[in-house]
Amino acid sequence: MSGRSRLFEVKQRVREVNIERKQHAPGQILSGTSYFFSELSQNPTLAVDFPIAPPQMAHYMECSTRIYSIYMKYVAPEDIVVYSIDEVFMDITDYLPASGMTAREFARKIILDVMDTTGITATAGIGTNLFLCKVAMDIVAKHLPADEYGVRIAFLDEMTFRQKLWAHQPLTDFWRIGHGYARKLAENGLFTMGDIARCSVKNEDMLYRLFGKNAELLIDHAWGFEPCTVPEIKAYKPETNSISSGQVLHCPYETDKAKLVLKEMADQLALDLVNKKIVTDQIVLTVGYDIENLSDPSRRSAYHGSIETDRYGRSIPKQAHGTQNLDDYTSSSHRIMNAAVDLFDRLIDPTLLIRRLYIVANHIIPEDTALQKKDRFTPVSYTHLRAHETSLH
């Protein structure tokens, strides 16, 4: 299995393996379970098992914050781009001369500091641009043997990328190539980055017909190029601003239970608005349903709505998605929560099990800007609103 398999994929594969083990077990009987390879190898009557750790996002966020503070001992915040809870990009170009270290030595020093401070090992990709850094980490470093301290570091430049990874498969291992892109490329006989690069020389127009303006970035990446830099990312100002919150529920939820989670998410979203001194005039909600709605025969027979296929090829009820405009700009927890619940009640099928919730506060602007829109938002009403919000929290 791949190193980033989904839980349902692991369960499915383990079920298949245990069917095979049962067929070859004495008397076709499995007497117990184990998740230790040595025990499973020696005892054919044991079924494969594995522990499932419940997610602890608050703990993960705390660890991520601690690790980021370690990064700042070596690199200034303006040279760090936080990509996810466990990944960052760093531009260390100007730090190497003063440190007297190579890029690999510099990265290793940071990684060892993280391990000494938190006990967490890290992997690094070094490259001549952002794309090569990401690919060096995702594809090359993660498959290298760790040193005595658990450190894995890989380097790529444009030429070594072409030498090592032009023939690599699957394409979905590469940053920014999803299953949809890979499927469309395969339909046109392109299965590797090398294929894409060669196609860009011989038949570039085909790539633009398939992907529009996004073909430009795809072609750049196929050759190991990346035009975007860390300073450009830090300077970027999006035309449309929003903040969001999403949850994948750890098990299928009935409507009432999912609504309670949504209320908590809406309340937290409003608190984020207040803390950041911004306001919104639109709430967007997306509700994703669980596969059990169609895999359970009794539920399947009762459902007559639209069906879509997820990225793993599974059939699920079509997700619910909608927008609720607010009367004016606000950061009121009460108003945002009510809007989210009204939207939820209007959109969802109450007979279906829910697995994902995603809420967005759209069109966000600073409080001061909202105050200037006197035709929509008066200073008096806003002062009253902020006082009410403060009392709620």
Where are these regions (language model features)?
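Broad gene-expression machinery/nucleic-acid interaction feature
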Residues: E87, T121, Q282-V284, R356
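DNA-contacting surface of Y-family translesion DNA polymerases
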Residues: D173, Y181-I354, P366-T378
